Structure formats: structure tokens, C-alpha cells
Amino acid sequence: PSMDARRGDVYNALYKNSEKITPERAVSLEELLNELDGKETVFTGDGVFAYREKIAEKMGGFAYFAPPMHMLSHASSIAYLAEKKAENGEFDDYHTILPVYLRTCQAEREYNERMKEFKTN
């Protein structure tokens, strides 16, 4: 999956079938496409809406795009994955599940900059 992280970056993780082969990360679209060069890849996520033409241009016949109804995450998909894990005896403690933030939001970055300036004055 790829999510538009703005400024030419995408949030993503790479999977082969259901095995995760990279951690969640924020990388430039160019870096991601160079990593995938010559590998058949299915693209999902809102990053596809923003970068489909660039992906197709760079990847050519190696790029496949999920149909629109499967492009974005749905709660039912998360429930399905949880069910599959449970069938394999894997359970997550819902009290410990947290979102993954790969970089600070713009408001937080600006606040930190102001605080840094304030401390130096």
C-alpha cells in the first residue's frame, strides 16, 4: 500500500503475498520506484491517485493497480486480517494497538521550531 505523504513522498510498506518485506516508512516516490524497478508490483492506496501516471511511466508493464473498490483500506479488510491471524492462534491485545506515525505533522514541526527559537532568545 502507498499513501500520499505529500511533497513527493509516499508512506508505504512492501509485501510479497502477505509477508511484510520492509517496515512502514516514508520515502520519496523516486526511491520507491527505483527499489521496485523490474519487479511486478500491485499498487494500492491513495498514493496511486496522486502518482499513477509517474508510476506507470517508470514501471511500465510491471505496474498493476488495484481496482478502485480495493484501492483504499476498509474496516472490513482489517477485520478479515484479524480473523485470519486468530485462526492461526495469533491475537493482538486491542489495548496496546496504536497508530504508526512515520513523521511529525506540519503543525508539530512548526511548533517545535518556534520553541527552539524561543529557547535561544
How would you describe each model-predicted region?
Residues 66-121:
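Acyltransferase
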Residues 1-72:
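Surface "functional belts" at beta-alpha junctions
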